[in-house]
């Protein structure tokens, strides 16, 4: 009888060590040192002694998981969410909000200080309540054949599997209260095996729900969903395709910002944390010190989150955005709020904005709010415009540091830095920086 050779699977034994953690990175991992290199520890906090299982050992760093806390930090708190140990939505519920904010501010300071070797201090932190803040969420839906049940929730940590959640304490209370009845009605649908995801949004006009379904819904399923929307007083949208949206009940959503009404589509980007967003916009207005003679350019303007409030104080404001649908919505909101001094344009922001017809008169103040990739291609154009003040709103401190260096080597100085705690209990770090021309 022929025998075939097969290589045996390499057996690896995880090393367990005891370390003292001295720092917390912006992602909520404890930082220690072992064998002359950094060790990032999930579940450990500064000043804690922990037993750690090494799960990854690289040349310059290692990663581990705290298996036992020998000496606990006074900043350690009990996670409020019953799903925290598995759900990948939050990473820092075991740390006090104060420690989370201080650690993110330190990380921001380090990244901004590194390029020039000069210490850049974070002036202050804009924050709000750490629970019940999230006004938007997308929940995955997955039917489990073995148990014949529907799972609804977020991805598991380091996995593509869904954690079936019954509550989420970071959601707005109105949305959190919908989770269990929503799961029940979705589980009762004939199409339960062919559902993609559900989006929940809490607008100032009320709650709304978007259901992505992969097959056509029966009349009975549609009736169930419509009855649910009336019972819970929410606007219902159905999405048979990723690029389609059918409104079944309710009105179009809107939110208030600085005495303005901003309407939006369920698929439009809005800031998740309304309280921090309101403070952020107010801070930007204060830093720009808007005067009646000012001409302001708002780059990556979206649907006018900053542009429209600025229009109340400046002579002219121009918002520029690459997505046509957002430009159209922003223009509609300008008309709705009778802001005749605000204009919106669609433009590829990698191209020279200073040469466009709407830029002929120039701008003395600029605000930009780019995506995570930053605005490297835009910075040279801003320098050509030569505004007196620039406010940079960032969702990625690494690209912020890179783009800041371009301004700092072109006659600008850094005046103020604020950390925005837009997403408590997560590793997301947002910030805003004020630059002025020397």
From Swiss-Prot:
GO terms for molecular function: 4 iron, 4 sulfur cluster binding; iron ion binding; RNA binding; rRNA (uridine-C5-)-methyltransferase activity. The active site is at residue 395. Residues 10-68 form the TRAM domain. GO terms for biological process: rRNA base methylation. Its EC number is 2.1.1.190. It catalyses: uridine(1939) in 23S rRNA + S-adenosyl-L-methionine = 5-methyluridine(1939) in 23S rRNA + S-adenosyl-L-homocysteine + H(+). Coiled coil: none annotated. Keywords: 4Fe-4S, Iron, Iron-sulfur, Metal-binding, Methyltransferase, rRNA processing, S-adenosyl-L-methionine, Transferase. CDD domains: AdoMet_MTases. [4Fe-4S] cluster binds at residues 81, 87, 90, 168. S-adenosyl-L-methionine binds at residues 271, 300, 305, 321, 348, 369. It is an enzyme of class 2 (transferase). InterPro entries: 23S_rRNA_MeTrfase_RlmD, MeTrfase_TrmA_AS, MeTrfase_TrmA_CS, NA-bd_OB-fold, SAM-dependent_MTases_sf, TRAM_dom, U5_MeTrfase_fam. It holds the Pfam family tRNA_U5-meth_tr. Belongs to the class I-like SAM-binding methyltransferase superfamily. RNA M5U methyltransferase family. RlmD subfamily. PANTHER family: 23S RRNA (URACIL(1939)-C(5))-METHYLTRANSFERASE RLMD, RNA M5U METHYLTRANSFERASE. Catalyzes the formation of 5-methyl-uridine at position 1939 (m5U1939) in 23S rRNA. This is 23S rRNA (uracil(1939)-C(5))-methyltransferase RlmD. It comes from Erwinia tasmaniensis (strain DSM 17950 / CFBP 7177 / CIP 109463 / NCPPB 4357 / Et1/99).
């Amino acid at each position: 009888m022929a025998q075939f050779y097969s290589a045996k699977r390499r057996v690896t034994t995880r090393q367990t060590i005891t370390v003292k953690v001295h720092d917390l990175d912006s992602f909520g991992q404890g930082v220690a040192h072992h064998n002359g290199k950094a060790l990032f520890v999930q579940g450990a906090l500064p000043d804690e002694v922990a037993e750690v299982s090494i799960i990854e050992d690289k040349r310059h760093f290692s990663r581990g998981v705290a298996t036992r806390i020998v000496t606990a930090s006074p900043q350690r708190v009990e996670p409020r969410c019953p799903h925290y140990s598995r759900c990948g939505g939050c990473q820092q519920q075991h740390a006090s909000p104060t420690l989370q904010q201080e650690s993110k501010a330190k990380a921001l300071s380090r990244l901004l200080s590194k390029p020039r070797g000069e210490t850049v201090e974070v002036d202050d932190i804009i924050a709000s309540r750490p629970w019940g803040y999230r006004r938007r969420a997308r929940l995955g839906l997955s039917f489990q054949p073995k148990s014949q049940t529907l799972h609804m929730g977020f991805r598991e940590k380091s996995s593509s599997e869904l954690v079936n959640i019954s509550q989420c304490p970071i959601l707005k209370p109105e949305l959190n209260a919908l989770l269990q009845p929503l799961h029940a009605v979705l589980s009762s649908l004939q199409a339960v095996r062919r559902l993609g995801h559900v989006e929940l949004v809490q607008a100032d006009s009320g709650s709304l729900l978007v259901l992505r379904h992969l097959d056509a819904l029966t009349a009975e399923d549609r009736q169930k969903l419509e009855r649910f929307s009336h019972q819970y007083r929410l606007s219902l949208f159905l999405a048979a395709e990723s690029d389609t949206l059918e409104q079944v009940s309710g009105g179009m959503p809107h939110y208030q910002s600085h005495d303005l009404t901003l309407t939006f589509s369920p698929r439009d980007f809005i800031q998740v944390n309304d309280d921090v967003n309101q403070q952020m916009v107010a801070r930007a207005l204060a830093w720009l010190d808007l005067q009646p003679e000012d001409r302001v350019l708002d780059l990556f303007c979206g649907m006018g989150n900053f542009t429209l409030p600025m229009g109340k104080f400046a002579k002219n404001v121009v918002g520029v955005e690459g997505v046509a649908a957002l430009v159209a919505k922003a223009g509609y909101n300008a008309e709705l709020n009778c802001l005749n001094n605000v204009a919106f344009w669609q433009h590829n922001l990698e191209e020279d904005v200073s040469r466009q017809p709407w830029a002929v008169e120039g701008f003395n103040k600029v605000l930009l709010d780019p995506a995570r990739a930053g605005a490297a291609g835009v910075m040279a154009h801003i320098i050509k415009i030569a505004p007196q003040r620039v406010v940079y709103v960032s969702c990625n401190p690494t690209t912020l540091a890179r783009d800041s260096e371009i301004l700092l080597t072109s006659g600008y100085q850094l005046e103020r830095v604020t950390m925005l705690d837009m997403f408590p209990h997560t590793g997301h770090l947002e910030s805003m920086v004020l630059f002025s021309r020397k």
